Design a protein with these regions (language model features):
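TOPRIM fold recognition
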Residues: 12-124
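Short amphipathic alpha-helical face segments that pack within enzyme cores
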Residues: 5-12
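Helix N-cap/beta->alpha junction signal
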Residues: 2-5, 57
């Protein structure tokens, strides 16, 4: 992950999407806190067959992904997970938009499901 907020966003999304998959708890995660630290992560990443990168959708994120690809080439499965949140700056922005969409849907359902209030008055 490029930043800690993206990691926390991932945990939130994972909990919502697949709360009953305990094998996900056995995975390791690296938070760079800046893509400028990607070189420091190259050695520890060498211990893994599969690497999933959750970098920002910007030039720096693409460059970090390129560096990891150059280091490991075809010997590792490398996934660019930023495709999941294409159109957003990062995973945290994607999560925020998902939450806002849910709020809008819930408020729209709430408005439609409420029947109009009856006025108190004289009835024959």
């Amino acid at each position: 992950f490029e930043g800690f907020m993206d990691y926390l966003s991932f945990l939130t999304l994972r909990q919502e999407s697949c709360p009953n998959y305990p094998e996900l708890d056995g995975q390791d995660y690296i938070v760079l806190n800046s893509v400028s630290n990607v070189n420091k992560a190259l050695y520890p990443l060498g211990n893994y067959e599969r690497i999933h990168c959750f970098f920002d959708n910007d030039h720096a994120g693409l460059e970090a992904l390129r560096q990891i690809r150059m280091e490991y080439g075809r010997e590792r499965y490398l996934r660019d997970a930023s495709q999941i949140y294409r159109g957003c700056k990062d995973l945290n922005e994607y999560l925020q938009k998902q939450i806002e969409r849910k709020r809008q849907l819930q408020s729209a359902k709430g408005v439609r499901s409420q029947s109009p209030e009856k006025k108190n008055g004289f009835q024959l």
